[in-house]
Amino acid sequence: LEVGILPGNHEGMAEIGFLVDKYGAKNLHGYTFKKGNVGIFGCGYSNVGIHQLNEEDVFKTLKKAHDSLTDVKKKIMVTHTHPEGSVIGLGMFPGSEGIKKAINTFNPEVHICGHIHETEGIEEKIGQTRVINVGRKGKIFEF
């Protein structure tokens, strides 16, 4: 079983590094891992809060990770925050422009996010990308 991890609102890289070292999880913040023909890449943190990234840095982090996925058939993008304009934001939480730009640029098959606890389980499509707020419970799906 492979486990990917990335920081949310309150975790710093020290905490993520500790969990990677202790449990062998894969840090997805700016990195990828591949399983067969599936490539997973991500960006943690949020565009608000203690450890915030600006929109340009969000996109650059996702691009850096995505650029190494040249030999996979399917891509999964994992972020803490939801994309700008998503129904996941309930019209109150604007989401990330950088994440929306990444969806439109890289066209991952699936985008997994969290951040808004109240919309756990909501799914939508942005272009051809299936966007899922997995929340705390998570979601199991197969390709």
What are the residue ranges of the model-derived segments?
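Active-site glycine-centered loops adjacent to acidic/histidine catalytic or metal-binding residues
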Residues: G8-N9, H80, G114-H115
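Hydrophobic residues at beta-strand termini and immediately following loops
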Residues: L6, C43, I132-V134
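Proline-centered loop/turn at the N-terminus of a beta-strand
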Residues: L1-G4, K26, G39, K74-I76, ...
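Short Gly/Pro-enriched loop/turn and capping motifs at secondary-structure junctions
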Residues: H82-E84, I116-T119
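Binuclear metal-dependent phosphoesterase catalytic core
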Residues: T32-N37, L53-D57, K100-V110, H117-F143
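Conserved catalytic scaffold of divalent metal-dependent phosphoesterases
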Residues: E11-G98
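A broad, low-specificity signal for short, low-complexity segments enriched in glycine/proline
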Residues: L1-P7, G91-P94
